[in-house]
Amino acid sequence: MAGLVVPLLEACSNPSPPVTGCVVTPTEEEGPFPYTPDGTTRSEISNPLNRTDVRSNYSDGVMQTGIPLTLNFLVVNTNGACSPVLGARVDIWHCNRNGWYSGYGGQSGGVSGTPSSYVGQTWLRGYQTTSASAVAQFITVYPGWYSGRATHVHMEVFMNGVLVKIGQVAFPETISDAVHVTTDYTAHGINTTRNATDSVFGNSGTDLANETLAMTGDVTNGFTGTYAIGIPL
């Protein structure tokens, strides 16, 4: 969301970070792999997903590998001049470097994995409540991809237990391409589905521009992605 991106240090230190422009984040499909254990509704999920570092499986601590990625989601009220929203719950989930999601056996399109073994696992999923600076931060790894989709992260926002936004965020392709030829990602290589032809992001160039993370960093040291979720509250 280029018009609403706030630099990391500014967003994390200023309780009322300024924004340039004020755009409602496009609503997108939830996707087939949200975390819903035992039929629990999304708004009722608590631990083990209340965490900043989402890289590990909660039950055994086994970590997903890949290039480090810090995600900073700023939540703003588009009905209030994009003022920061405190106390919003931001949920995220995404696939691992080989294109698989935790918690599901019936999936396809990834490589070098056994989806049936991922049932009951929780890696690369979590939620945080926006802090005094209206930022929810996550420590994760750069996602891979699976057939038919551009590289992406799913996100949802709840206010007072009510779902107020479902969305997905894309990555700049030049960065994804550089990541996906590094050692941890070579089993799949460069994503064959581009942002502009993706079934979610490809329907509007304007929406794609407003759904793309602002990225800093490199493949050696890792990346930081920043995104402002604009919601009319």
Regions found by a protein language model. Give the residues of each.
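C-terminal, well-folded lobe of enzymatic/effector domains
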Residues: 210-233
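Beta-strand-dominated extracellular/periplasmic modules and repeats
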Residues: 19-207, 230-233
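N-terminal export signals
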Residues: 1-14
